[in-house]
Amino acid sequence: MSKTVVGFILVDAPHSALNNAGADAGDRTDNIVRVKSIRRGRKVYPYVSGQALRYWWRDTLEKKYDWKMSPIERQKKIAFTSANPIKYDDDDVFGYMRALKAKEGGTVTRISPLKNSPLISVIGQTPTQDFGVMARHEGDPVPYEHEFYSTVLKGLFSLDLDSLGVFYTNEKTGYRNMYPQLEEEAEEKGLVKDEESGKWSMPNDTRIKRAKDVLKALPYIQGGAKQTSHLTDVSPKFVILAAIDGGNHIFMNITKEEDGDAIIDTEALKDVLIEYSDCLLTDVYIGRRKGFMDNLEPNINKLTEEILIGNRKIKSGSIKEAVDQFTDKIEELMKP
C-alpha cells in the first residue's frame, strides 16, 4: 500500500498579477510587463508557475513553522542546496540535485515528496492592460504598461507520505539520495537503516511533523508579484483533502467554466469519490472561505450527508477546520 495525500485548491485572484513573464520581444514598446498565460484554442488562461507556488509554500514554512532551510550555494552557472535532508526540512520535502566530486559520492538527487501543478485560471480570459506613469521627477512623465486579471486559479498537489524522511542509497536516478558523509551523519543521529533495501528512515515523529507542517501551512500561504498595487490574498479559498492508496490525482477534473464563472462540479466530485472509494484511506475534507462561492453551500451540505462506499464520509467546514481535521489523521497514516 502506498499512502499519498491529494489536495485540490482554488485561489481567488480578483484584480491580480501574481506571476509575470516580463517583456515580450514582439511588443511595440519595451516597457510592457506581461503576466504568464497559456492558450488553449482561442482562449487565454493566466497562470502562476508551479515553481512560484513552491516558493510561496517554502517561504511560509520558513516564516510560520521555523523550518530550517538549506543554504543555496552557487558555482559558475549552477546553484544547488546542501543536499542534506536530515538537517534541512526543505531538502527532504522539496527535493534536490547536487553533483559532488566522485570521491565525495558523485551526483545525488531526491525527487520531491511534495508535487504540485501550476495555478491555472479556470476561466478563459484576456488580461487587462493597465497604463501608468512615473511622474515624480522633473520633465516629461515616463509611461509604462502592465497586465492584470480577474479570475479564479485552480491547483493540485500531492504529498507522498511514504517518501517523507526516507532516503535511499540505491544507484537509481531520483532515488540515490545519500552520499558517504550524509550516511555518517545519519548513523550519528540514530536513523534506522534497512541493509537489504539501502533505505534510511528518520524518526517517525520528525516525519509526521514535516508532513503536518506542509499541510497546516495551506491557510497561511502568502506571496505573489505586484502586491503593492494589486494586493491579493493568495491563500486557498477552497480546498479538498484526502489520503489515497496510489499516486494518481483523483480531483483533476472537478472544476469548470460555466457562463463566465468558475464552478465546482459537485456531481463530478461525487462520481470520482464513489469510483475510487476503494482507494480512500481517510474521509474527504472540504474547506471553503465564507464569501467565496457561497452558492456551493447547499450542494456541499448535501454531499456531507451521503456515506461513501467503505464508510468514508465527506466532511466540510472552513479552510482551517478542514486542514486541521485532516492533519489530525496524519499520525495514524504514518504509523510504521
Show which residues each predicted segment covers.
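RNA-binding basic/glycine-rich loop and surface signature characteristic of RAMP-family CRISPR effectors
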Residues: M1-P336
